[in-house]
Amino acid sequence: ACATKNQRCASWAGPYCCDGFYCSCRSYPGCMCRPNS
């Protein structure tokens, strides 16, 4: 399963974001999926 908007993700080990989202690690407490612009 892939992670969608505002769900936790890990760019190095998974879970990976769904198509159309990228893993952003700028927010606390960890990485979250954000929509691609």
Curated annotation (Swiss-Prot):
Q: Which residues carry this modification: Serine amide?
A: 37
Spell out the subcellular localization from the entry. Secreted
Where does this chain mainly localize?
secreted
Q: What tissue expression does the UniProt record report for this protein?
A: Expressed by the venom gland.
Q: Which PROSITE patterns match?
A: MU_AGATOXIN (PS60015)
Question: Quick one: a GO biological-process term for this protein?
Answer: envenomation resulting in negative regulation of voltage-gated sodium channel activity in another organism
Gene Ontology CC terms: extracellular region
Enumerate the residues marked as the site Pharmacophore.
8, 12, 22, 24, 26, 34
Citing just one GO molecular function, the answer is: sodium channel inhibitor activity
Listed A to Z, the keywords are: Amidation, Disulfide bond, Ion channel impairing toxin, Knottin, Neurotoxin, Secreted, Toxin, Voltage-gated sodium channel impairing toxin
Quoted from the entry, the domain comment is: The presence of a 'disulfide through disulfide knot' structurally defines this protein as a knottin.
Cited function: Binds at site 4 of sodium channels (Nav) and inhibits the fast inactivation of cockroach channels. This toxin is active only on insects Has a potent activity against S.litura larvae.
User: What name does this protein carry?
Assistant: Delta-amaurobitoxin-Pl1d
